Design a protein with these regions (language model features):
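Charged, terminal alpha-helix-loop-beta segments
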Residues: 1-171
Length: 171
């Protein structure tokens, strides 16, 4: 539990730019994706509340049933906020935005609403492709929110392989 508190504090420091970071290339951020995992995999996107902070990371993992079930390399991070007129305002935080991203955001909003989520201000993490894996959690209980893994430690290498290879190595 203390590790979760430390991870939350680090995420706060990184999101508020209290700690400069240039090593995001080696981090895998794992998110709980219970009800949305099928949509996430199909559309190669994960969304989260815009107000949640996060540290720099290049890889995203989807967690369900005591295991990371899919991982992908992030290609774009885009926020979408509904203004007072009901229109979406986009901000590209990383990468570039294509029309396909806007279409996927609209699909995510509809999908999220059908599950009871209030989709007015979200951050969308687009990955090149999610690859199936089975990276089992070794600690008791589900992670509370986000977990960050240093892939150089997990894979015991300084050279991160392509995502498909990594997914196989983690399984």
């Amino acid at each position: 539990e203390m590790q979760e508190v430390l991870d939350d504090f680090l995420n706060y420091c990184y999101s508020d730019r209290l700690i400069p970071v240039s090593d995001g290339w080696k981090y895998l951020r794992v998110q709980l994706a219970g009800q949305t995992i099928d949509f996430n995999r199909q559309e190669n996107v994960y969304y989260d509340d815009i107000h949640r902070g996060f540290r720099a990371h290049d890889y995203l993992g989807l967690y369900q049933n005591k295991s990371v079930r899919a991982i992908g390399k992030i290609e774009a991070i885009i926020t979408a906020v509904r203004n007072e007129q009901g229109e979406l305002e986009y901000n590209v935080e990383r990468g570039t935005m294509a029309e396909e991203h806007k279409a996927t955001i609209n699909k995510a909003i509809e999908s999220g609403r059908s599950k009871g989520y209030d989709m007015v201000a979200e951050r969308y993490f687009f990955v090149e492709q999610f690859y199936d894996t089975d990276f089992r959690k070794t600690t008791p209980r589900a992670p509370m929110g986000t977990r960050i893994f240093d892939l150089t430690q997990v894979l015991e290498t300084e050279k991160i392989p392509d995502v498909e290879t990594m997914a196989k190595q983690l399984a």
